[in-house]
Amino acid sequence: MPNSITTGLPLLDRLLYQKGWAKREMVLFMGFAKSGKSTAMGEFSINATLAGYNVLYLSLEVHTTILSDRFDARLSETEMSKLVERRDEVHRKLAELGATKGIGSLWVVERPSGSMSPADLDRMLNSMKANGMVPDMVVVDYADLMRASYDLRDDRANIRSIYTDLRALYDKHNVAGITASQTNREGGASEVATMMHAADNIEKVRIADLVITINKTEEEEAKGEARLYFAGSRNQQGGISIRVKQNLEQMRFIERILDVT
């Protein structure tokens, strides 16, 4: 029996070793600036919640008010630019969803960049559990903006420590873990970013159980398309490329899967 959380996309679930985001493991999305990393993590958090799972979303970059608007846009399938003028319709759709049985909880916590360590997150999870709030998935947006639990006085060593401790935390609390990191300039210019394009420290991609890069040419971006590339995996075949249709105005990272190669 797979020990995983659905992605919300049956085809993507089938491509994953545990038929979803595996518990006790870390998935790392990598992409250049503004490639949609936060949108991806938001979408998969919502999909898990709609499937009945509880999700903790820790934001170290985007304010909760903006995240709330993004989640409202995604859930109501409304363009971000039209949330205000269509607020009555949005509220109606959200109320209908809220009345649906079997929906999980999505807890969103905002902290300043550099203020939260894996040890702090561990204490937060312990406190949540003591109050009956038990997440199935923990999303960190994103790990590069955490601080090390113990300052090693070396940036590369601190990054390695953050990812090692975060991966251990996902294991300890039996949750599916998702985070993201930025590719370097070369990765942003490449048609397909690989593990070698990790910014700051390649050790982070060695620690992650699954590394998925977000890729799009200018032509693909104009068509609302992107490619997800399985750049590295501990438990399954790598090198898989998934071409997807997006609707980023509605915060839909994957509207549908176009093909898999």
Can you name each region flagged by the protein language model?
Residues D13-Y17, L50-V134, A148, S241-V244:
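Cytosolic-facing regulatory segments adjacent to core modules
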Residues T78, A99-K101, P118-V138, D171-H173, ...:
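C-terminal regions of RecA-like/P-loop NTPase motor modules
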Residues K34:
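Walker A (P-loop) phosphate-binding loop of P-loop NTPases
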Residues M1-L15:
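N-terminal pre-Walker A segment at the start of P-loop NTPase domains
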Residues W107-K172, R234:
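Phosphate-binding/switch loop-helix module in NTP-utilizing enzymes
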Residues K37:
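Conserved lysine of the Walker
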Residues Y17-R24:
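Phosphate-binding P-loop
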Residues A40, F44:
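Hydrophobic positions on the alpha1 helix immediately C-terminal to the Walker A/P-loop
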